[in-house]
Regions:
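Conserved short alpha-helical segments that host acidic/polar catalytic motifs at enzyme active sites
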Residues: 1-214
């Protein structure tokens, strides 16, 4: 079981990340995002065994912020769901990247092995950005997947949260897999929320059936 979280406020994003650690803390992933077109960089990605230290993340952000002007922060915490993995590997840690797509996924892709390319990926979640690169369409890509699929996706200076099966709580521009103060639970599945004007709002939807009914 994994957890995802994010906010425009780093301290809040980290607090929401910590709320999810009860769901799994084998490894952690972090992304600081910039949405400014004139900036030389678009993101800072950090991956770690265990739990992030907030002060270390702040220092990494400070080192690059004059170049990137980061304005949103997203986390992932992981407990392996499709293996008995005990040794940490950076290549197995979210977010996964292919071309311009970055994805952090909370759940399991039950039809992972039905994709002809599956043998090229050691972690089921890592196939998602690859498929997005082929389709360039989030709703079409996720409609081909089965299982628990809630994720965050960053591409082309746009940020999305996909709700499909796994739990999701949202309050303005903040989200988490775990309930937090003033947050609303997103009950509908098969929806794609886009971060726009400091709010996460529904942008699109896709056909989704929860095979686990949870």
């Amino acid at each position: 079981m994994c957890g995802i979280a994010g906010s425009s406020d780093l301290e809040k994003a980290y607090t929401l990340y910590k709320l999810n650690l009860k769901r799994g803390s084998h490894s952690s992933g972090f992304m600081a995002l910039s949405f400014q077109e004139d900036k030389e960089c678009i993101s800072l990605v950090e991956k770690a065994k265990g739990i992030f230290n907030l002060n270390l993340l702040k220092q990494r952000i400070k080192d690059l912020d004059n170049v990137c002007n980061f304005s949103y922060f997203a986390f992932h915490s992981r407990a392996p769901t499709n293996s008995t993995e005990t040794i940490w590997k950076e290549s197995h840690t979210h977010p996964f990247n292919n071309d311009s797509y970055y994805v952090a996924h909370n759940g399991i892709i039950s039809n992972f092995k039905s994709f002809p390319e599956h043998s090229s990926f050691e972690v089921d979640s890592s196939i998602i950005p690859y498929l997005l690169t082929k389709n360039h369409n989030i709703s079409q890509t996720y409609s081909k997947l089965q299982g628990l699929l809630t994720s965050w996706v960053f591409t082309g200076k746009k940020f999305y949260v996909v709700k499909a099966g796994s739990s999701l709580w949202v309050e303005k521009d903040s989200f988490s897999s775990s309930e937090f103060e003033n947050a609303e639970r997103i009950k509908e599945d098969g929806v794609i929320l886009e971060l726009k004007d400091n709010f996460l709002t529904v942008k699109d939807s896709f056909k989704y059936t929860n095979p686990y009914f949870i």
